[in-house]
Design a protein with these regions (language model features):
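Active-site-adjacent loops and short helices of periplasmic peptidoglycan-processing enzymes
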Residues: 43-206
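Domain-terminus/edge residues, biased toward the C-terminal soluble/receptor-binding domains
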Residues: 172, 183-188, 192-404
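Bacterial N-terminal signal peptides that target proteins for export
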Residues: 5-27
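Sec-dependent N-terminal signal peptides
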Residues: 27-33
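C-terminal segment of classical bacterial N-terminal signal peptides
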Residues: 34-43
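N-terminal targeting leaders characterized by basic, low-complexity, disordered sequences
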Residues: 1-2
């Protein structure tokens, strides 16, 4: 397997772990907890399938939720990303602080012939929220232009902010000429930049994450409620798909996608495809390869007790320490050992409620596998047998053994 104890962050290994010897039963219990929660997921096969098969993509990439590259082809090639542009449009709009539910006067905007449009024109009004939904689901180019004007007063000013934001995010192979992604000289990005953008958008803005998962959206266009279908076939057909955005130019197609299975989220991007179907086929190939080539491990469980600490404000009471979230990671079975680093409060330190206690990061062959943070709970642990810490620990040990 090449995994040296994915259960690595046992409290006995935490910094400042020079605890009294009578803490021993807790250490044994915690080791048991981690040994069980770190069992490999049966859904992820332990085979090396080589490289994924790509039929059309000139550039491709697949990463995990940490941003770790699992596979790439021409990751920094600068290629037309078409309507994937609209993810940055949404990011800039949401970061502007503009009122999503305010009503904005719309305009007649100039678009290329046959460009996808919802039908907005001067004399109509819309909320920014509805414009964003039409733009992200149906890829309405007129909606993207209206978003830009509503937020910045003009498309030009908005595009300037898009490029500034790209620089701030370190997207060094990305340049925008418009807010919608219609073909324009100098308008390009790379798969490495786009998965970074996509991961940021999906994890930072619930509106984006929830909208790109929709199969259709109904919005007012003038006085008519119009139902607009999603351009994303991937989100309708691929198990675990989350979104996020399609792209189609005059000569190439593209796709930025995300999916989640067994607690692990993947991001994939393909650029330079030649058909609408091919972009989805290649994305599926990337993700299928990742699921099958890596082993999934649960490295932290929010419901599992990690350790208990003495409560700072009440003698004899203790507070539980747990992971802040369930954390999974992908481990390459033929790679090197999985190791970890842990930074944590010294054992025995008086602890309040809902306070950070430590952070653990697992790595394999230099890549980050997963990161977990740990905090004290928001309630005191009930005392079942007097005030003794050992009695408290033994109670949890028995309860855990019975549950197992």
């Amino acid at each position: 397997m090449g995994v040296s104890t994915p259960t690595a962050c046992r409290p006995s290994q935490m910094s400042g772990a020079g605890a009294p010897s009578r803490i021993g039963p807790l250490l044994a219990f915690v080791a048991l907890v981690f040994a069980l929660v770190a069992a490999p997921s049966p859904a992820l096969a332990k085979t090396d399938l080589g490289e994924p098969t790509l039929t059309e993509a000139q550039a491709a990439i697949v990463t995990d939720q940490e941003g770790t590259v699992l596979f790439s082809k021409n990751p920094d090639a600068e290629i037309n990303m078409a309507s994937i542009t609209k993810i940055m449009t949404a990011v800039v709009a949401l970061e502007s602080g503009a009122d999503l539910d305010a009503t904005y006067e719309l305009h007649d905007v100039t678009l290329a012939e046959n460009a996808m449009a919802a039908g907005y024109h001067a004399g109509m009004t819309s909320t920014l929220r509805d414009l964003l939904r039409a733009m992200l689901v149906y890829s309405a180019n007129d909606a993207a232009s209206e978003v830009a004007i509503a937020v910045s007063g003009s498309e030009e000013a908005f595009v300037q902010r898009m490029n500034e934001r790209a620089q701030e995010m370190g997207l060094s192979h990305t340049h925008f000429e418009n807010p919608h992604g219609l073909d324009a000289e100098g308008h390009h990005s790379s798969v490495s930049d786009l998965v970074t953008l996509g991961r940021y958008a999906m994890t930072t803005f619930p509106l984006i994450a929830s909208t790109v998962s929709l199969h259709s959206v109904t919005v007012p266009v003038g006085n008519v409620q119009v139902t607009l279908p999603s351009t994303d076939e991937f989100v309708r057909t691929y198990p675990g798909a989350l979104g996020i955005k399609t792209g189609a130019g005059d000569y190439v197609t593209s796709f930025l996608g995300s999916a989640r299975r067994d607690g692990v989220t993947l991001y994939a991007c393909v650029l330079g495809c030649t058909t609408r179907e091919g972009r989805f086929t290649d994305t599926e190939s990337l993700m299928d390869w990742a699921w099958k080539s890596y082993d999934g491990y649960q490295l932290a469980s929010k419901s599992g007790l990690v350790r208990v600490e003495t409560y700072a404000l009440r003698f004899g009471q203790v507070v539980a320490v747990n992971a802040d979230a369930d954390v999974w990671g992908l481990v390459w079975p033929n790679g090197g050992p999985t190791t970890y680093t842990m930074t944590a409060n010294s054992r025995g330190m008086l602890t309040g409620l809902s306070e950070p206690v430590g952070v653990c990061q697992w790595t394999q062959d230099g890549r980050i596998v997963a990161t977990s943070s740990y905090s004290s709970g928001d309630k005191l642990v009930p005392t079942y047998t007097g005030f003794g810490l050992i009695d408290q620990i033994e109670h949890y040990t028995r309860a855990f053994a019975q549950a197992a």
